């Protein structure tokens, strides 16, 4: 991956719907050359997909929270990941180092839905402990990772 590939990635993270013509112009390539580079980056697994950035508040999910999760000794990572992938409010789950095992980003309709989610995780999700923080605002978001 060279400097032009990094420029292409930056442009795509800012606007995943940019045309190849505009992308090429932004990085000093023809539309065809830009398209070839994007295809190669996808083939090589550097670009794993294109997603829409959703305003959860406009979608009726105004309460965004970060939940640190420590799994119960009896639970496995695979079981937890499979269970949380089914839960609509969970928008992101990352396996982390430190005192907790995972951090979840969730978008809930209200505190009642957040409470139900936390109870479900502890009852059926193999979770021993959680630490939850409500997001006041998002300073910025980069492209999907």
PLM feature segments, named:
Residues 1-145:
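A compositional/biophysical signature of low hydrophobicity enriched in polar/charged and small residues
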């Amino acid at each position: 991956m060279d400097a032009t590939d990094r420029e292409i990635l930056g442009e795509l993270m800012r606007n995943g719907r940019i045309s190849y013509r505009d992308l090429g112009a932004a990085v000093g390539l023809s539309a065809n050359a830009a398209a070839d580079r994007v295809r190669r980056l996808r083939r090589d697994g550097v670009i794993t997909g294109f997603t829409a950035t959703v305003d959860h508040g406009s979608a009726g999910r105004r309460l965004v929270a970060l939940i640190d999760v420590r799994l119960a000794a009896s639970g496995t990572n695979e079981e937890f990941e499979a269970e949380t992938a089914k839960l609509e409010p969970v928008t992101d789950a990352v396996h982390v180092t430190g005192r907790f095992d995972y951090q979840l980003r969730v978008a809930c309709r209200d505190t009642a839905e957040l409470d139900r989610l936390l109870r479900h995780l502890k009852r059926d999700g193999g979770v021993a402990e959680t630490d939850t923080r409500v997001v006041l605002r998002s300073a910025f978001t980069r492209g999907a990772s």
